[in-house]
A protein has these predicted regions:
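Class I S-adenosyl-L-methionine-dependent methyltransferase catalytic core
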Residues: 1-10, 16-170
Length: 170
């Protein structure tokens, strides 16, 4: 049931106690990163983060990986400004985001760098390039964690932003 509970938005959870009073219940932290990660960046044509979150949880629940202990990796071959990647990171997954539009990827990278700094999350950024079918593909790979302790213990997540044509992969 806990997995099904991730499909919806919940605002508060209470139990009824003596005299009809409501006592707030703690349902535990389910998000790896705060919900604002996929919500702050606004632009025309943006995919709904709430819809993406629901679809990602439906796909995971229907898969053989529903109860996997290790983080999954989500591939978004036409990421735009990375809404799907950011939702994956919120859910504690890794993300590989590919797009042909350099401007969109730069905006996503700048936003994520600022987000990590603002929230004081420990991270590393590695810039590299790979060649796919004789075409150079610039890559920015962020390695980060939700806490300093997890980062020190190498319990990290990654966001890989790659500029290129998804038709080259495969």
């Amino acid at each position: 049931f806990a997995l099904l509970g991730t499909h919806s938005t919940r605002l508060m959870l209470f139990e009824c106690v003596d005299g009809g009073l409501l006592r707030p219940l703690d349902w535990g932290r389910t998000a790896y990163l705060p919900d604002d990660l996929s919500e702050i960046l606004k632009y025309k044509g943006k995919t709904s983060a709430a819809f993406t979150h629901m679809m990602m949880n439906c796909a995971r629940a229907a898969s053989d990986f529903a109860l996997a202990d290790q983080p999954l990796t989500v591939l978004d071959p036409m990421c735009g400004k990375c809404t799907t990647g950011f939702v994956a990171l919120q859910n504690g997954m890794n993300a590989v985001c590919l797009d042909i539009d350099r401007k969109d990827l730069k905006e996503a990278a700048d936003y994520f760098s600022n987000y990590l700094q603002f929230h004081r999350l420990k991270h590393r950024l590695a810039q590299s390039s790979r060649t796919l079918q004789k075409t150079p593909v610039p890559i920015a790979e962020y390695t980060f964690s939700d806490t300093k302790e997890h980062f020190a213990a190498d319990d990290v997540r990654t966001l890989m932003l790659a500029e290129g044509d998804s038709g080259l992969v495969g």
